[in-house]
Amino acid sequence: MTGDKGPQRLSGSSYGSISSPTSPTSPGPQQAPPRETYLSEKIPIPDTKPGTFSLRKLWAFTGPGFLMSIAFLDPGNIESDLQAGAVAGFKLLWVLLWATVLGLLCQRLAARLGVVTGKDLGEVCHLYYPKVPRTVLWLTIELAIVGSDMQEVIGTAIAFNLLSAGRIPLWGGVLITIVDTFFFLFLDNYGLRKLEAFFGLLITIMALTFGYEYVVARPEQGALLRGLFLPSCPGCGHPELLQAVGIVGAIIMPHNIYLHSALVKSREIDRARRADIREANMYFLIEATIALSVSFIINLFVMAVFGQAFYQKTNQAAFNICANSSLHDYAKIFPMNNATVAVDIYQGGVILGCLFGPAALYIWAIGLLAAGQSSTMTGTYAGQFVMEGFLRLRWSRFARVLLTRSCAILPTVLVAVFRDLRDLSGLNDLLNVLQSLLLPFAVLPILTFTSMPTLMQEFANGLLNKVVTSSIMVLVCAINLYFVVSYLPSLPHPAYFGLAALLAAAYLGLSTYLVWTCCLAHGATFLAHSSHHHFLYGLLEEDQKGETSG
């Protein structure tokens, strides 16, 4: 770890906390220049009267939370929203609300870790976890990033197809995403604030486009408010339950926790002053709350629109609506039967156009395009931070995005060429499940490290935080178990059960290890092993020196 000063000793112990020039307990001189990322620009924080709230200071801290909130608005979330609306109407709006609150709590921990330690979650994982579990953990997060990027590619390809009235085939839209990704790489050359402003513009486009759909759909406000504030689901069965757990899995993204812990490092914070750290934590929490409130409203727009337009609609009804509209050529995408319509982000845009005119279709596609493009860039940042943090490996932006986008495009373009649109949308649903399955590999580490007094000092999680975040972890594990139990019977061949068993064993092995180290961080001394005492007492001084020399 570059520039580390020897750790402060705990009473009678040979262990100490991470201590660097940016640590709250070690304001000593810097030994070597810090490791930089391509977001190395630091935004200065204006001086204001101590103990008072300042809009100027809030504005200076504004940015990381809105970049983080984009993961709550990616094409995977949009598809989850519209499917929940089509399947359950307004009955699952309260699930969306509380999933967003749970997401805010996780992001709060991520921001706090970055502010207090001056290091992102990937860097802290590199310091504390041994090589083998650290490498496996890194691979799982990379898998989550590639999965998220695939969703962005799918959403963008469908948006181009809708905007071109089908002239750009799906595989063509997938290939276009290669070009537009590298175009966005040049944006950060114009400064961090301009980059953050551009992301703000994309969020505004989503708010306006999906807000327009909400206005023209005119959902019933009384039913909407009941669905939002009454935690119940009358008459619901297995499909509604599956959508409910899908909402939680789509909202809380594993790579986003790693991303947020790194983005907060872009602000100049004097970590030698506890008051400045406390103030930064407060302003970042306010900003994240505002950003996720905006993302919640946008998600609500989508779920409410499709709860109004699609709920309990049959394929025959959708066919008739389109056949009698100016978009009658699209009617053929709906089978002529009385089965409940299975909606996706493509069919969603079509039915909006059939119901409310072609403008609604094109505006939907623009919003979908904004969702895909904004998520593309945040995924690139997350990949860069994760690779640098876990591996101490610096790649150029071009090389990093080429790796991620290649891994995302190859399977996506194969599905787009050799299968149909329904398979592409089905792949999107499967990727939402993947994100949920990988979520413990972000939540467990952030809960572990933010609960360590040796690392976080007075900013470690209190009892209430530990109870709430542990409850989130239990909820996530229950959701994953439900997904697995629901999915296993659909495996096409008995041979797949063997592969599933191997993957499950590896998954449980890593999860068990992370739970064990989390228990150590919470003070379970009876579980301690000599090679893992640092989860209880902090890092050995020679460990930190080794990082410095490395």
From Swiss-Prot:
It comes from the Eukaryota. One of its GO terms (molecular function) is cadmium ion transmembrane transporter activity. Macrophage-specific antiporter that fluxes metal ions in either direction against a proton gradient. Localized to late endosomal lysosomal membranes, delivers bivalent cations from the cytosol into these acidic compartments where they may directly affect antimicrobial activity. Involved in iron metabolism and host natural resistance to infection with intracellular parasites. One of its GO terms (biological process) is L-arginine transmembrane transport. It is a multi-pass membrane protein. Keywords: Endosome, Glycoprotein, Ion transport, Iron, Iron transport, Lysosome, Membrane, Transmembrane, Transmembrane helix, Transport. Residues 1-58, 106-142, 188-196, 260-287, 370-400, 451-466, 517-550 are cytoplasmic. It is found in: Late endosome membrane; Lysosome membrane. NCBIfam families: nramp (TIGR01197), Nramp_1 (NF037982). Residues 1-45 are annotated as: Disordered. It catalyses: Zn(2+)(in) + H(+)(out) = Zn(2+)(out) + H(+)(in); Fe(2+)(in) + H(+)(out) = Fe(2+)(out) + H(+)(in); Mn(2+)(in) + H(+)(out) = Mn(2+)(out) + H(+)(in). The lineage of its organism: Eukaryota, Metazoa, Chordata, Craniata, Vertebrata. Pfam families: Nramp. Glycans are attached at residues 324, 338. Residues 11-23 have a biased composition (Low complexity). Induction: In response to lymphokine or bacterial products. This is Natural resistance-associated macrophage protein 1. InterPro entries: NRAMP_fam. Belongs to the NRAMP family. GO terms for cellular component: endosome membrane; ficolin-1-rich granule membrane; late endosome; late endosome membrane; lysosomal membrane; lysosome; phagocytic vesicle membrane; plasma membrane.
